[in-house]
Swiss-Prot record:
Protein name: Actin-depolymerizing factor 9
GO BP terms: actin filament depolymerization
Job of this protein: Actin-depolymerizing protein. Severs actin filaments (F-actin) and binds to actin monomers.
Matching Gene3D superfamilies: Severin
Gene: ADF9
Recorded coiled-coil stretches: none
Length: 139
């Protein structure tokens, strides 16, 4: 179904791979990209479970927008192992204005397609999504 604000559709693979991350923990992260030609949101990269947060952060381009989800494992103050799924809206200052507008107008609709997101991060610079910030948001 197309997004009324931006006219974008969400490729079914986005939802299937997210369900796999959420239920079977088949991936550590998923990076999504808007395909301008097809006018839809598609899976760009799947991060394997052995990949860490630094690997994930390195996949986000310095001058292009992306959406992503990351499955963060952490230990609580009570020494309990937990996991939270983060949604990232990556919109660097150096990205094209049209791209930033397209990602911004599609974000809420796309995020609603991914049922089970627990935290959201909007970042324009890597410092806004450091591992310390993510861990603090998880608790």
């Amino acid at each position: 179904m197309a997004n009324s604000a931006s006219g974008l559709a969400v490729n079914d693979e986005c939802k299937f791979k997210f369900q796999e991350l959420k239920t079977r923990r088949g991936f550590r992260f998923i990076v999504f990209k808007i395909d301008d030609k097809a006018m839809e949101i598609k899976v760009e990269r799947l991060g394997q479970t052995a990949e860490g947060y630094e690997d994930f952060a390195a996949t986000l381009p310095a001058d292009e927008c992306r959406y992503a989800v990351y499955d963060l494992d952490f230990v609580t103050d009570e020494n309990c192992q937990k996991s939270k799924i983060f949604f990232f809206s990556w919109s660097p200052d150096t990205a094209r204005t049209r791209s930033k507008m397209l990602y911004a107008s599609s974000k809420d609709r796309f995020r609603r397609e991914l049922d089970g997101i627990q935290c959201e991060i909007q970042a324009t610079d890597p410092s806004e999504m450091s591992l310390d910030i993510i861990r603090a948001r998880a608790h």
